C-alpha cells in the first residue's frame, strides 16, 4: 500500500506505480533482446530506438510504414484472462501490411495503455509482441507503456503497433503490369485473425456460451482460446517467393472489409477481381459464426477473411512456380480467381459460385 509523503500526495496515490513500470521493463528485456537483427542490436530504455539501415543490407531503399491495433479481440483476451497471443496479432496486423508493398519489416514499436499496470500481464503481452517480431524478422526497438487511471476500467487495456520496413527502389508492389487474365491465389488464414470481433462477441453473447466452454468448432479448446488463435504472419514466405520468383504482381491483406474492400485497393481502376467462392475452404469457426448468428454470406464476406488471409496476383504462366514457392514455406494455397475487365463505376470485386458455410 502506498503512503503519502510528508508534503502530501505521491504519484502512486494518484494511481500510477512507477515501480511497477520499472519491474515490467526488467521482465521484458530478454524477450526484446530475442528480436535483434542486423541493423538493430541496442538495449531498450533510451529516448528513441535506433536502426542502422545500411547494416540491414539495403542500397537504395524506400521506407514503408504501417500502424494498426487488435480491436475488440482484446476484450476476449481480457475476459478470458489469456494475454499471451494478442501481441502476435498486433505485429501481424502491421507487418502484413508492409509485405503487401514488397517491403521487408525492419523494426517495430508498441503502445500499451492500461488503467492499472500488472507487470505479469504486461510481460505476457510484450512476450507475444516479441514472438511476432521474431516470426516477421523485425526488431522490437522500443515502445510506450502508459498507466492511466480513470481512462480505462480495471483490467482493461489497449494496444497499438507501429512497423517500419524497406524495399529497394523499383521493387515496390503492386507492380504496374497487372493485366486481364492474371490469376488470383489465396493464402489460407489461421482463423478470424483480428477483424470483425465486435460481431464475434455479439454472436457469442447470443449463443450463451462462456469463454471457458468447449469451442463448438475446435475440439479440445476452450471457446476463448480458440477465438484468440493469433493472426497468421505471412512475411517470410512471401518475401522469399517475391525474391525467388520475381513473379508476384500484387498482394492484398484481407482484413476488415474482406474481399470487396481490400482487393480493389491494389488493382488498377480498369480491372476487377473475379472470385470463385467455391474455391474458398471455409474453416469451421466461420461456419459456426454464420449459423449461430444467422449472418448472411454477403455480410460474412465483407466482415471476415472467411479463410483467406492474403491474396497474390500472378500471371497465369507463373502460377505453378509461385504456388510451389509458397507451399515450400508451409503456406496453403488455392487458386481463387482471375482479373477481369472492369467498367467505369463497377465493383472492384465480383463473385461466382457460393460460399460453403
Swiss-Prot record:
GO terms for biological process: 'de novo' IMP biosynthetic process; adenine biosynthetic process. GO terms for cellular component: cytosol. Its main location: cytoplasm. It catalyses: 2-formamido-N(1)-(5-O-phospho-beta-D-ribosyl)acetamidine + ATP = 5-amino-1-(5-phospho-beta-D-ribosyl)imidazole + ADP + phosphate + H(+). GO terms for molecular function: ATP binding; phosphoribosylamine-glycine ligase activity; phosphoribosylformylglycinamidine cyclo-ligase activity. Transmembrane segments: none annotated. The keyword Transmembrane helix does not apply. Pathway: Purine metabolism; IMP biosynthesis via de novo pathway; 5-amino-1-(5-phospho-D-ribosyl)imidazole from N(2)-formyl-N(1)-(5-phospho-D-ribosyl)glycinamide: step 2/2. Keywords: ATP-binding, Cytoplasm, Ligase, Nucleotide-binding, Purine biosynthesis. It is found in: Cytoplasm. It comes from the Bacteria. The keyword Nucleotide-binding applies. Its EC number is 6.3.3.1. It is an enzyme of class 6 (ligase). HAMAP family: AIRS. Belongs to the AIR synthase family. This is Phosphoribosylformylglycinamidine cyclo-ligase. It comes from Rhizobium rhizogenes (strain K84 / ATCC BAA-868). The gene is purM.
Amino acid at each position: 500500500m502506498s503512503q503519502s509523503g510528508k508534503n502530501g500526495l505521491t504519484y502512486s496515490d494518484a494511481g500510477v506505480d512507477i515501480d511497477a513500470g520499472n519491474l515490467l521493463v526488467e521482465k521484458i528485456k530478454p524477450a526484446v533482446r530475442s528480436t535483434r537483427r542486423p541493423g538493430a542490436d541496442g538495449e531498450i530504455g533510451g529516448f528513441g530506438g535506433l536502426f542502422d539501415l545500411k547494416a540491414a543490407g539495403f542500397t537504395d531503399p524506400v521506407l514503408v510504414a504501417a500502424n494498426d491495433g487488435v480491436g475488440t479481440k482484446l476484450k476476449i483476451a481480457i475476459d478470458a484472462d489469456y494475454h499471451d497471443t494478442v501481441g502476435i496479432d498486433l505485429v501481424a496486423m502491421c507487418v502484413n501490411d508492409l509485405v503487401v508493398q514488397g517491403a521487408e519489416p525492419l523494426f517495430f514499436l508498441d503502445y500499451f495503455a492500461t488503467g492499472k499496470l500488472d507487470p505479469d500481464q504486461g510481460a505476457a503481452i510484450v512476450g507475444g509482441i516479441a514472438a511476432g517480431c521474431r516470426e516477421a524478422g523485425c526488431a522490437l526497438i522500443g515502445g510506450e507503456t502508459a498507466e492511466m487511471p480513470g481512462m480505462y476500467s480495471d483490467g482493461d487495456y489497449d494496444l497499438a503497433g507501429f512497423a517500419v520496413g524497406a524495399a529497394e527502389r523499383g521493387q515496390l508492389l503492386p507492380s504496374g503490369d497487372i493485366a486481364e487474365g492474371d490469376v488470383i491465389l489465396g493464402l489460407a488464414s489461421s482463423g478470424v485473425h483480428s477483424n470483425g470481433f465486435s460481431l464475434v462477441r455479439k454472436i457469442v453473447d447470443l449463443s450463451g456460451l462462456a469463454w471457458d466452454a468447449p469451442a463448438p468448432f475446435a475440439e479440445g479448446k476452450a471457446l476463448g482460446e480458440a477465438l484468440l488463435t493469433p493472426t497468421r504472419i505471412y512475411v517470410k514466405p512471401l518475401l522469399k517467393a517475391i525474391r525467388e520468383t520475381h513473379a508476384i504482381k500484387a498482394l492484398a491483406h484481407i482484413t476488415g472489409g474482406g474481399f470487396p474492400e481490400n482487393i480493389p485497393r491494389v488493382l488498377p481502376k480498369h480491372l476487377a477481381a473475379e472470385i470463385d467462392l467455391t474455391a474458398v475452404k471455409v474453416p469451421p469457426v466461420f461456419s459456426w459464426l454464420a449459423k449461430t448468428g444467422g449472418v448472411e454470406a454477403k455480410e460474412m464476406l465483407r466482415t471476415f477473411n472467411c479463410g483467406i488471409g492474403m491474396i497474390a496476383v500472378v500471371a497465369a504462366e507463373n502460377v505453378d512456380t509461385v504456388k510451389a514457392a509458397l507451399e515450400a514455406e508451409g503456406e496453403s494455397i488455392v487458386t481463387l480467381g482471375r482479373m477481369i475487365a472492369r467498367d467505369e463505376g463497377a465493383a472492384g470485386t465480383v463473385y461466382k459460385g457460393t460460399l460453403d458455410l
